Curated annotation (Swiss-Prot):
Taxonomic lineage from the root: Bacteria, Pseudomonadati, Pseudomonadota, Gammaproteobacteria, Pasteurellales
General function of this protein: Promotes RNA polymerase assembly. Latches the N- and C-terminal regions of the beta' subunit thereby facilitating its interaction with the beta and alpha subunits.
Gene Ontology annotations of biological process type: DNA-templated transcription
Tree of life domain: Bacteria
Reactions the enzyme catalyzes: RNA(n) + a ribonucleoside 5'-triphosphate = RNA(n+1) + diphosphate
Protein name per the record: DNA-directed RNA polymerase subunit omega
Organism: Actinobacillus pleuropneumoniae serotype 5b (strain L20)
InterPro entries: DNA-dir_RNA_pol_omega, Pol_omega/Rpo6/RPB6, RPB6/omega-like_sf
Alphabetized UniProt keyword annotations: DNA-directed RNA polymerase, Nucleotidyltransferase, Transcription, Transferase
One cellular component (GO) term of this entry: DNA-directed RNA polymerase complex
């Protein structure tokens, strides 16, 4: 099990409160298998993996925003394609 120093991760993010929000968002992605971990899992829980990624500077609030925006765009495109497909099939 990897050891995570919360203070080092907080220093990367800026403060403990933003660290909690960022780590929770990332851990949720990992838990739902929406994204692959950027560090070896080493049988760690998603929260520990998220903190390790933050500590190494691989994830921050800005990166999380970009990932979520990209996911929303991809979802929108997929929905539009599905609507177009159904319209073609029915009409």
């Amino acid at each position: 099990m990897a050891r995570v120093t919360v203070q080092e991760a907080a220093d990367k993010i800026g403060n403990r409160f933003d660290l909690i929000l960022t780590a929770a968002r990332r851990a949720r992605q990992l838990q739902l298998h929406a994204r692959e971990p950027l560090v070896p899992e080493e049988n760690d829980k998603p929260t520990v993996i998220a903190l390790r990624e933050i500590e190494k500077g691989l994830i921050n609030g800005q990166i999380m925003d970009q990932l979520e925006n990209n996911d929303a765009i991809q979802q929108e495109v997929a929905e539009q394609e599905a609507i177009s497909f159904l319209a073609d099939v029915q009409g």
